[in-house]
Amino acid sequence: MDWPEGLDTQSFSGIGRLATASPQGAQAADILDRFQILECLVDYGPEVIGTLPLGIDIATSDIDILCNVSGLDAFGLFADQAFGDFAGYTRHRRDATDHVGAAVVVRFECEGLPIEIFATDRPAREQYGFVHMLVEARILHVMGDGFARKIQDLKQTG
């Protein structure tokens, strides 16, 4: 099926969509740009996903980044070097499940905005998080802005 412009996988690459999705998305794009977070991760094919690029974020939303790594241990050491000095830095290894391979999960804050990096041996655009975001984007497109606001309201109330 052909999707309207803006709903294809290419439309979600980089920070362009993030910068225009919402005020918090613009803040997130600015932080990613100023601190060169995606440039630092360029060898791992980073993709920003989640509620921020969709414009359905709430105050507690974080920046979610998917990465593709061939060696989890090496990526963990890289992350320690690259992000270890950021506030709240943590890193853990997540065991494989029936649906997702083993992963390294990195969390830290940058200017008060939480960032989570999920790195596994699968290309970012093939990971469930990216596919899930595309499905959400298409549902939001079909259902319209009113539906998106209802989703945000539900997220606010837990």
Model-identified regions with their sequence ranges:
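"Short basic amphipathic alpha-helical interaction patches in structured regions
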Residues: 78-82, 121, 131-133
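Metal-dependent nucleotidyltransferase catalytic core
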Residues: 16, 20-34, 69-111
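Helical scaffold of the NTase/Pol beta-like nucleotidyltransferase catalytic core
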Residues: 1-49
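Active-site nucleotide-donor binding segment shared across nucleotidyl transfer reactions
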Residues: 35-74
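Hydrophobic anchor at the start of a short beta-strand
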Residues: 46, 86, 115
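Catalytic cores of NTP-dependent nucleotidyl/adenyl transfer enzymes across multiple folds
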Residues: 123-158
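Hydrophobic N-terminal alpha-helices or hydrophobic patches in metabolic proteins across all domains
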Residues: 42, 97, 127-130
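A eukaryotic "domain-to-IDR transition" signal
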Residues: 105, 109, 113-118, 125-126
